[in-house]
Amino acid sequence: MPRIGAILIGQSPRPDLVKPLQKANPHFQYIESGALDFVDEADIPATPRGEYILTTRLRDGRIVEVDEKFLFPLLQKAIADVERQGVTLSVLLCAGPFDGLSGEKPLYRPTAMASTIMHSRGSQRIAVLSPNQTQASAINQKWIDRGFSPIILVDPGLPDVELAHWIKSQLSFTSVDHLVIDYVGHPIEKAKTLEQILNISVIDLGKIIGDMLRHITP
């Protein structure tokens, strides 16, 4: 069975992130490798400092915050790890941009994929749902750097239907081309619910990889 690399910013395994990929395309074997597999837990900075702080999980389920720059070389190791195991391509299961990350085989990054899709549609004004206030500033700059005019909304943690109405109230009198869900690890039904109620195109960085995999044949 052909293999696809599933690149994680935390520790492997992450069945909650990989099972949706298996459901999207069961004709591949998914080889997981996590950035934090390559460091001792004691070496993970207790107080991360940097422009882009990301949240992930350790193997035991604990949540940690890590800086994009700390993760970058570790992700390169994770890519090399899955490529040694014969993958045909790799997918990054994280909404962080990680510009410059690469391997010998094709690597698909959600932020880059979403940017390409929106530019192909001529979109510029976008609303972006940030997972928390900590990441809001970095997420805002990420989309500005890619040529968009973002409106950043920090997810208040409401159920999907209530969240949709909250977003609608936040965007009153404002027109946007897309709503971007800028995080991963949530139920795939979230985007569908928001799209139906808001009546705007929703691009979900947690779902975009699975959507792509449905169109790949071994």
Segments the model singles out, each with a brief description of its role:
Residues V82, W143, Q170-F173, L194:
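Generic structural signal for hydrophobic
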Residues V91-P97, S102-A136, Q141-D145, S149, ...:
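Conserved mixed alpha/beta catalytic, RNA-binding, or beta-rich assembly cores of soluble enzyme
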Residues F38, S123, L158-P159, V202-P218:
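Short, flexible loop segments at boundaries between secondary-structure elements
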Residues P73, L158-S169:
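Structural motif
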Residues R14-P15, F98-L101, A114-T116, A136-S137, ...:
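Short, well-ordered alpha-helical microsegments
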Residues V66-T111, D177-A191:
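N-terminal glycine-rich phosphate/adenylate-binding segment common to multiple enzyme folds
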Residues T88, E162-W166, D177-L198, L205, ...:
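Hydrophobic alpha-helical
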Residues M1-V66, S130-E162:
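N-terminal glycine-rich anion-binding loop in soluble enzyme alpha/beta folds
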